[in-house]
Structures are given as C-alpha cells and as structure tokens.
Design a protein with these regions (language model features):
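Anion-binding and metal-coordination hotspots
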Residues: 1-278
Length: 278
C-alpha cells in the first residue's frame, strides 16, 4: 500500500468475489436534518470503537450536546451503551441480533440464552428440560479500548441423560465427548439490561421514526457521495489530508442538500415522516 495511515479492509466493491483486502479509511458521518454536522476518519476496520471518540470530539467543538444518539447495529456494545448513559444521552442503537432474533431458527434454538427463562430474584436460568443453570463464577473481561465488562458464568449441575443435549450444547470442535459435557455460558447482566431497554425504545413509534430517518439521512449521505458525486477513492495520502478532503466533500454535500431543500420548499423539515398503511 502507498498510504501508511490506511488499514487493509474488506470493501463492498468486490469485483472478484474473493474478499480481497484493500487499504482504506473508516469514514463516519454525523447527520442532522440531512446535513453532515460532523465527521471523523480513522483506521478502525469496524464501527464499534468509533462511536465514543466521535461523540467526544463533536461535543468539544459544538456549543450543544445531542440528546438522542441513533446508530446502526454495528455500533452496539456495552461500552457504547454505558458511555451514552453516563453522558446523560439516550441511545437508539439497533441491537446486533435484532433481525436474526425474529427468525424461526433463532426462536427454536433452545441453546440460546434468549430462549431460556431467567429468575432474577434467585439469579438462575431454566433450560428447556427444566434444569437450572446457576451462577458459577464472575470474571472481568477487558476490551482493546480498555473497557472492563463483568461477565457472569452460568453452568448446569447435571446434563446427563438429557434428551435435548445435542440441540442445546454447541461446539463440535470440543475434545470432550458430548456425553460428558454440561451446558455453560457467560453473559453480562449490565449489557442484557441495556439491550432490553434499548430494544423497547427502538420499537416505539419514536424509535421507528428515528431509525428510518437514520437509514435515509446517514446512509443517504454516503449514497450521494458515491453515486451522485461518483467519488470512489481518495486522491490524497495520509490521514490528515484525507480528513481535509472528506470535510470539503461534506461541505459540497451540504451545499447541494440546501439547494435541493430550498427548491423543494423543505427547509423547515428535519425528519421524514413514516408512511402509514391503511
């Protein structure tokens, strides 16, 4: 690669269909009322670790703080939820398992923690066979960013002679025979609580409206950049130069957006309304 600041990533434009890695940057757009109000660019191959630095630097430069943070499933993590809570903001983040959790395969998977009954008072799960999975231990897991998450490990006392064992216990690469294995999993109580609260918000009327507008406005800014402006590759090298180029492009997007909104008499509109079915 010719840019030492870039990172090899898998691109959506994969003509050979072989998952070829190309040097690239992770560009993040913060959009409000269809205008790009803030952007960052970095070498992170995934979106999860970009949210907190994005919000921090945006709040340092702006004179106000956004109350509601709307993001896609790629930004969901306990660390991001916790930061938004501590920052007195409200998260509208689509859970990573939101789409798959609606499938029949997911709902019928008896080995998933989501399909087990939880007794909050006594802190144990009950599996399909009626056996209890009790708390075995607690461990602290540290992420690459330094965030520490408390994981609770639950285990079943006895899984012998269980008719649901093959469907419940996963992991075919284990050296221990299935007959000798017991059901065990780890989970974060804090993350489970955060995801549950967030799910209630995103399926509400307000949540649906904000999620639809995120898809239209945030994804739309990249669609206009790539499709309408035919911008596919940065002309500069080095992260600072690429950032400057991205800012110029965002300014051009905003000018075009303002012109189109004036022509369509939509300058006072901040959100697209949901289409109502009969």
């Amino acid at each position: 690669k010719t840019d030492v600041d870039a990172t090899f990533m898998r691109m959506k434009e994969d003509a050979m269909k072989n998952g070829q890695l190309k040097p690239a940057y992770n560009l993040q757009h913060g959009v409000d009322s269809e205008y790009v109000v803030w952007l960052t660019i970095g070498p992170q191959p995934t979106d999860t670790t970009t949210l907190i630095p994005f919000l921090k630097i945006m709040e340092e430069r702006l004179k106000f703080k956004y109350l509601k943070i709307v993001a896609d499933a790629g930004y969901e993590s306990e660390e991001n939820y916790s930061f938004i809570e501590e920052n007195n903001q409200i998260a509208f983040i689509k859970p990573a398992n939101y789409e798959i959790s609606k499938t029949r395969k997911f709902k019928n998977d008896i080995g998933k923690i989501e399909n087990m009954e939880y007794n909050e008072a006594k802190d144990f799960y009950t599996c399909r066979s009626g056996k209890q999975l009790k708390k075995e231990s607690i461990k602290i897991k540290k992420s690459k960013t330094g965030y520490e998450s408390e994981k609770t490990i639950y285990a079943c006392e006895d899984c012998s002679n269980c008719s649901c064992k093959i469907s419940c216990i996963k992991g075919n690469n284990s050296k221990i025979p299935i007959e000798q294995r017991t059901k065990k999993f780890e989970t974060s109580k804090k993350f489970n609580r955060q995801r549950k609260d967030d799910l209630e918000r995103i399926v509400s009327d307000e949540g649906c409206l904000l999620r639809v507008n995120r898809s239209i406005q945030a994804e739309g800014s990249f669609a206009q950049l790539k499709q309408d402006m035919d911008f596919r590759r940065f002309m500069c090298r080095g992260q600072n130069n690429v950032l400057a180029e991205s800012i110029l492009l965002a300014m051009a997007l905003n000018i075009n957006k303002l012109h189109r909104k004036i022509q369509a008499n939509r300058t006072g509109k901040h959100l697209f309304e949901l289409k109502k079915t009969a």
